[in-house]
Structures are given as C-alpha cells and as structure tokens.
C-alpha cells in the first residue's frame, strides 16, 4: 500500500472507502470513556490535518494510543471515509496504528499545544517548523521560489550558479565576511605589519559574496538573459527586524536591455508571483488573513491591479520636503533615502508601489550607467508598502572609459576588476539588471514584519546558533 500525503486527500485525489497509509505527527488527541480516540494528524504537506478515529479493538489502543501527546510521530493504515462531523471533510478509520517516535517528556516539550510568540519560536528555531504559522511561511516561501524559476524560464532566462567565495567587492563597501584558512593565533605578516594574504588558501584576500552580479554580467554578455538565486552575505552591524547577515537574493541580468525595460520586467515578475500565490496557496494565505494580516487578500489583489508609480530621485526629495512631516533622518538632495522616507512615499503619499530612478552618482555603485547630465546614474529602487526597498537595480555602465572613471572616483583599483573591464573591451553591449531580497519579498507578501521569522535559521549580529 503506497504512502499518501494529507494534501493528496484534500485535493480529492484519493477514492473514498479505500485503504490508505499516512505518516505524520500528532496535533491533538481526544479520548472517550467508551473506547474511542480522535487523533488529529498533520504531515506538513498542506495546512490541513486529518482526523484519525481509533477504537479499543486495536491491539495497542491501551498501551500506545491512550498515551499519545502532541508531537508524537505516527503511521496509520485505515479506510478513508467522509466525516460525519462538520469540522472536516474526511477522516480515517484506523485498522493499524503505529507510534514511530514518542515525546520523551511532554511537560517540557518546547512546542506545546498553546500559542507561542514569534519571539519565543526564534529561540527554538530547530522545532518551530512544527507550528502552523511557520509551516505556512515555509510552503509560501517554497511556492514563490518555484514560481520565480518558472517565470524566468518562460521568459527565456538561464540560471547561472555564481560563486559564493569572491575576491571582489561588488558593492564597494567594507561590510564583507572574510574567508580564510589561516591560523588566527599566528597570522602571517608582511614586513610592514600588514596581513600576508599570499600565504592564505586562495593566495589573496577573499570574501563571502555580497552579490553575484559581476559574474552574472559575464554570462549575460553571451547568453543574453541570465539570473542567479542563492545566499548572499553582508557583515552589516544592524540588529534590526529588516537585516540578516545571510539572506537569499534573486539577481537578474539582461543584455540589450535599458532601465525602462528592466523596470517593466520587474513589475511583471512580481505580479506573476502574487497571482500564482492567490491561485495555488489560498489556504495558507487565508490562515495568514486570520492570524497575521486581515487585509492580506485585498492587499495582494490591489497590488495586482495598480500601476507602479515612477518618479525621479529629485522629485521624491521634493515630495518629502514639501510634506512638512518631521522625519528622524534629515531630508536633502544628495542624501540617501532612509526606510522612513521610503515608507512615507509608498504608504502615505502615493499609497502604491513606487519606483525611484536617476539617483545622484555619489549614492550608487560604480557599475551603474552615468546619465547624460554627468551627475546622476540610471539606477532604480522599487519600494513597496510595509517594507520600503524591495528591488534595487540599474542599467549597467557599458563604456569602459566611464567605468574606469567611476572606479577611480570611488577609490577602487581597476586592476582588481580586470576581467569585468574585459566585458567592455570585447563586444560591449548595453545591459541592465536588478537584485531582489527574497526574504523581503516574503515579508511583504505574508505581512510578517520581522525578517528573522521568514528564513529557517536566521544569521544575525551575535547570533549563529543552530
């Protein structure tokens, strides 16, 4: 007899009154004095549980079944029947019931029947996936991941596995994790006292990647449309609900594509994801509606129906200055927008997703294309309500002379970027791309405000447990 998942039962894939076998964990047990027990079992394949009816005719009824507690792992063989109760559509009349794993001490089991706060669940991250909420988040995360791959494949994009270890600083910042095999108690030094990285594993200073963009551009210049999707690392000392040291990033690069075209593409991609979730994950979405965000369905439907607002950075600054609102962070031209500025624009002023374009070059990375005014770059940040920046991208600088100038202005050695510069020397093309924080997208969709509740094992400042 084949193993059946609970999701298959609720998809009406299984014929009623046929024998089936399921595996799962106990969510609850009710037992009557007349010799019947009603055990709720889940297996994580969907939000639903299934009720199992076990009676005293089972050989291990008194020995095992009457001692079941939440969390016990079980396998049940029985007959799938239509439930006579109104709380569930199906139930299983058990003919064989086996306990695979007991909860050693139910009184100290961290995931008990009571409701737990998200803060508490972070402390038991290895067990929190056993709760309904985290299960919902994981299934939604999985569906978004699969939907992105499906969408990009339909659009003719190829997935490229970019390296996690790099010798380049893509963003030009110092917030990188260093990779080394050197003995920290006896670090080799040069005569001048600096670290001799030639003695290290890679023979040079190396880091965990902050972005796969530069490598991705190399393949965009031959395959036209490419993307990468994987973990990214930032040693940013920010202990907030919006920051992780390790997170997942989707990065897109498209040759023969300008800023306007990549903007349209990003909007189409996000709307495809939301539409797919409302179609295929509606039960999980409804759970979030009941427990996290009462407006989630209307919010996602509105997201599908509105056009994204597009404004210049200068106009965004003018709106903020004219709002007369007192911000914690000063607003002026040439200052990077803070989260409070971004959220004011999308939540108070426009009440819709906003794309800000054409930032001052001083605020952006060396690889962004310099505009004709020589003061701004063809950059874009896509902002959404509740989150702020979701996507950051630009048209890339394809002119080697301008690229070299920007590297020099930012104090970066062009020799370190020799292969990246080669892309401009040999058959250069105009191209554009963007990066999207995967956890931020999930946060926006689910309404879960703390990003640490969205990734299975969060890595943050002073925290690398589990």
UniProtKB/Swiss-Prot annotation:
BP term (GO), one: asparaginyl-tRNA aminoacylation
GO cellular component: a single term: cytoplasm
Known catalytic reactions: tRNA(Asn) + L-asparagine + ATP = L-asparaginyl-tRNA(Asn) + AMP + diphosphate + H(+)
Record's keyword annotation contains Acetylation: no
Gene name linked to the record: asnS
GO molecular function: asparagine-tRNA ligase activity; ATP binding; nucleic acid binding
Enzyme Commission code: 6.1.1.22
Name of protein: Asparagine--tRNA ligase
Location relative to the cell: Cytoplasm
Keyword Thylakoid set for record: no
PROSITE patterns noted in UniProt: AA_TRNA_LIGASE_II
SUPFAM superfamilies: Class II aaRS and biotin synthetases, Nucleic acid-binding proteins
Keyword annotations of the record: Aminoacyl-tRNA synthetase, ATP-binding, Cytoplasm, Ligase, Nucleotide-binding, Protein biosynthesis
